[in-house]
Amino acid sequence: MCNDTATPQLEELVTTVANQLMTVDAATSAEVSQRVLAYLVEQLGVDVSFLRHNDRDRRATRLVAEWPPRLNIPDPDPLRLIYFADADPVFALCEHAKEPLVFRPEPATEDYQRLIEEARGVPVTSAAAVPLVSGEITTGLLGFIKFGDRKWHEAELNALMTIATLFAQVQARVAAEARLRYLADHDDLTGLHNRRALLQHLDQRLAPGQPGPVAALFLDLDRLKAINDYLGHAAGDQFIHVFAQRIGDALVGESLIARLGGDEFVLIPASPMSADAAQPLAERLRDQLKDHVAIGGEVLTRTVSIGVASGTPGQHTPSDLLRRADQAALAAKHAGGDSVAIFTADMSVSGELRNDIELHLRRGIESDALRLVYLPEVDLRTGDIVGTEALVRWQHPTRGLLAPGCFIPVAESINLAGELDRWVLRRACNEFSEWQSAGLGHDALLRINVSAGQLVTGGFVDFVADTIGQHGLDASSVCLEITENVVVQDLHTARATLARLKEVGVHIAIDDFGTGYSAISLLQTLPIDTLKIDKTFVRQLGTNTSDLVIVRGIMTLAEGFQLDVVAEGVETEAAARILLDQRCYRAQGFLFSRPVPGEAMRHMLSARRLPPTCIPATDPALS
C-alpha cells in the first residue's frame, strides 16, 4: 500500500478495522486492540505496531497494546510508561500532536532510535506516529515501526488518521462506560458505595455455601436535621462527607461501607461474625465518631445510633439482613440515640405486615380486589400523550389501598408473581382495547411490567400472544418492561424468551436502566427497543451533576445501539428541560401527572395532550 492516492485496499483496511472496533467494550478492548494491531502490521508491511494512551494527570503515555508481543521484556520496561517531561524529543512531540508524525533514520531522532534499540534490539528504524484526538485534546498515539527505512505516503497516513479516530472513539466509549459504572455504584457526595453496590455485595456474601454469619451495622446520625436547619444543607453535606471519612479511618481491613442516602450508612465487616461479635466494633465506632467537626466556623458534635444484625448464607436475603439492622438502629434511636442495639425478635413488628399480605394476597387476586392505575407518558416537545404504563394497586381488606412496593416483593417470594402478572396483562389489554374501540389511543403505547419469574416460565410467550389476540390489539402497541436484574438471573432463558416475544411483535423495554450490574453488555445481546432511565438519575437533574453525566452516558449508549429512551421520575421543569437538551423526548413523572384511574386516563387520551402549563418551554430547534 504505497500509492499517494486513496486505494480500494486502504478503504478496505479502514472498513475492516471499523467493523472490529464497533462493539468493543471495557472487557474486550485490550484483546481486540491487539488483534487490530496484528492486522495492521500484516497489511502495512511493517514490523511493529503499538497503541498508547495519554495520562493527562501524570503527563505520561502508557502502553495499551502492541504487536507482536515482545519477548524478554526488560524490567523495568522502558516502554510501559513514559513521562513526557523526561521523554526523548520524538515522544515529547506526541503529547500534543494533532497530525501524523514520520520519523526516519537521521541525527534528529537519535534519542528515539536509542530507546527503540534498548526495547527491541534493532539499531535503525522508520516510524509513523498517528495521534488519537478527541475534540481538541490528544488522548493517545497509534504507532508503527519498520526495521530499516520506509517511506510513508500521504494516502496511508490519511487512512491511519481515520483508524486513529476509531481508536479514540473506543477510548472515549470505554472511559464513559467505566465512569458510568462507577457513578452507578457510588454515592456522589461521599464516594462510598451506594445501595446498589451494597445489595450486590450482600447477594454474594449471603449466597449458599459462603462463610457466615454475615454481620451488618446500620448507622443513623442523630439529629442531622438541626445542622441543615441551622447552617444550611451545604454544611450538612460537609458534615456527612467528614463523617464518611471517619468511618473509613476507624476501620481495619476490607469492610464494605455504603451510604444509603441522607444520614444512613451501612457497614459490612469483611470477616464472618455474629451480631454479638460485631457489637464491640459498633461501640468503638460510636465512640470514635463523636469527635468534634469544624464546619463553617462552627465546632459540631453529633452522635450516632447503630443497629447490629446478622444473616446466614443460604437462609437470609440482603433485604432480610438490612431490615433487621434498620429495625435495630431504630430501636437504638428510640432509646435516646448515641447507643448500639442488637436485633431481637421483638423488633420485627413490621414482619406482621408481610404475614398479613401473604395471608390475603391470593384471595385478593382471585376476588378482583386489585386495581389498575395508569401513568401517562408524554412527548416533551409537544405535550402529546404517547403512551401509558399500567400499574397495579391492591385494595387490602383492612389496610386500605396498598402500593405495589408493599405486596409485589411478597408475591415474588411466595410464587404469586406470575398469577399477578397475568391478571395485570389481561386487565390492561382489556381496558386498552376498550379505549381503542372508542377511537382513543391508537397512536399510544401500552406499557406493562413483567416480573422476574415470567421470563423463565414456560407458556408465558403464548399467554402474551393469546391475550393480545383475544383483545384485538396490534402487538406493536404493547411494550413489556423488564429490569436489568431480572434478565441476568437467567440470561440464556431470558434472551430466548425475549426473542420469541419479539416474534409476537411486542416492544421490549429495559426498565430502571442504569441500576443493574450488566447494563452495557446486555445491550449487545438482547432484542430490546427502549431504555427507561431510572428515576434516581432523573429526579435531581439540574442540581446533581453526577446524574447529568449518567443521563448523557445512557443517551450516548442508546444512540449507539439505536434504542429509544424514556425518562422516569420527571418532577421538575428543570429536569424536563435538561432531558430535552439531551434529546430525550419521552418522559413520565409527577410533573405531568400522577398515576390515575382508567377513566381519567381515558379522558387524557381523548384530549390527546396535556395542558400547556404541564409542558416546559422548549427550544424551537428541538421541536
Swiss-Prot record:
SMART domains registered for this protein in UniProt: EAL, GAF, GGDEF
Domain GGDEF: 212-345
EAL domain residues: 354-609
GAF domain ranges (all copies): 28-171
Single Gene Ontology MF annotation: cyclic-guanylate-specific phosphodiesterase activity
GO biological process: cyclic nucleotide biosynthetic process; cyclic nucleotide catabolic process
Coiled coil: none
Domain of life: Bacteria
Protein name: Uncharacterized protein Rv1354c
